[in-house]
Regions:
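Catalytic phosphate/metal-binding cores of nucleic-acid and nucleotide-processing enzymes, i.e., regions
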Residues: 2-161
Length: 161
């Protein structure tokens, strides 16, 4: 199902089944522009993106940050070694050719945060049009942002009681 949007500046946009919104571009144009990936090419793109982000964070933040080994259903995120205020931070890296799927990705990051007993989980998503690791998108819930800023998840545990 495709829905049309019009922004205040009069530029139209379409939203496709995946929830991707592009200003001034029809879904048909997007699907023609984004080539279909095979499973192998998708895995390669994902691995390359994880390496790009891990290397950037290791150079800028802490040299102990690196890609994690995949562990199946008990996955603890794509990038490990990142800590803030004594708590682990789980990073889920996503390269879907510039498409954003925040709901499922945030859910995956939350599952992996729980598996790792981490302070917060976040998603770093590939931004179309740039390969600069510092220009990629970061997605997280407000609860995870608050945990990151305060160094604990106490506010979340209190809300659940």
């Amino acid at each position: 199902m495709t829905r049309s949007h019009e922004f205040a500046d009069g530029i139209g946009a379409t939203e496709g089944a995946a929830g991707v919104v592009e200003r001034g571009v029809t879904n048909e144009a997007v699907s023609k522009r984004v080539p279909k990936r095979s499973r192998a090419s998708a895995k390669k793109a994902g691995s390359s993106f994880e390496r790009l982000i891990a290397d950037h964070l290791a150079a800028v933040v802490d040299d102990r940050i690196d890609r994690r080994v995949k562990t199946g259903s008990q996955d603890r995120g794509d990038i490990g070694g990142l800590r803030h205020m004594g708590g682990r931070v789980v990073i889920e890296a996503k390269d879907y050719g510039g498409r954003l799927m925040p709901g499922p990705w945030i859910g995956e990051a939350e599952t992996e945060r729980g598996n790792d007993d981490a302070l917060c989980g976040l998603v770093i998503a590939k931004r179309r049009g740039t390969t600069d690791p510092g220009d990629q998108f970061v997605l997280m819930t407000v609860n995870d942002l608050t945990a990151l800023l305060t160094g604990n998840r106490d506010h979340i545990n209190q809300e659940e009681k």
